[in-house]
């Protein structure tokens, strides 16, 4: 097989809302969908726990997470890269 296999792992982009736990960040992923019956655009959000080995991501950072093997009871995602650093206020 000379063709590279396409990765079946999902990747999502979201905002870090909590970095209080060791090696773990909580990521809020928002998506906008159209309601089937009424046609209104609705914002839906989900929170994911992602593994941050070095503890380098802080609250407010926009990051990309990738699906992985289960790391703990609630952690099935790994942080892959920083998209945007948090603004300092």
Swiss-Prot record:
Pfam families membership: Ribosomal_S17
Keywords from the UniProt entry: Ribonucleoprotein, Ribosomal protein, RNA-binding, rRNA-binding
InterPro entries (UniProt xref): NA-bd_OB-fold, Ribosomal_uS17, Ribosomal_uS17_bact/chlr, Ribosomal_uS17_CS
Keyword RNA-binding: yes
Coiled-coil positions: none
GO molecular-function terms, A-Z: rRNA binding; structural constituent of ribosome
GO biological process, one term: translation
A single Gene Ontology CC term: cytosolic small ribosomal subunit
Family recorded in the similarity comment: Belongs to the universal ribosomal protein uS17 family.
NCBIfam families: PRK05610.1 (NF004123), uS17_bact (TIGR03635)
Job of this protein: One of the primary rRNA binding proteins, it binds specifically to the 5'-end of 16S ribosomal RNA.
Subunit organization: Part of the 30S ribosomal subunit.
PANTHER family to which the protein is assigned, alphabetical: 40S RIBOSOMAL PROTEIN S11 FAMILY MEMBER (PTHR10744), SMALL RIBOSOMAL SUBUNIT PROTEIN US17M (PTHR10744:SF1)
Entry protein name: Small ribosomal subunit protein uS17
Lineage, uppermost ranks: Bacteria, Pseudomonadati, Pseudomonadota, Betaproteobacteria, Burkholderiales
Gene: rpsQ
């Amino acid at each position: 097989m000379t063709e590279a296999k396409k990765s079946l792992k999902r990747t999502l982009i979201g905002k870090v809302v909590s970095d209080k736990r060791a090696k773990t960040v909580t990521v809020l992923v928002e998506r906008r969908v159209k309601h089937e019956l009424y046609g209104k655009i609705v914002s839906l959000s989900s929170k994911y726990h992602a593994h941050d080995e070095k503890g380098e991501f802080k609250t407010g950072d926009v990051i990309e997470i990738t699906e992985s093997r289960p790391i703990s009871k609630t952690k099935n995602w790994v942080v892959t890269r920083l998209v945007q650093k948090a603004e300092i206020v």
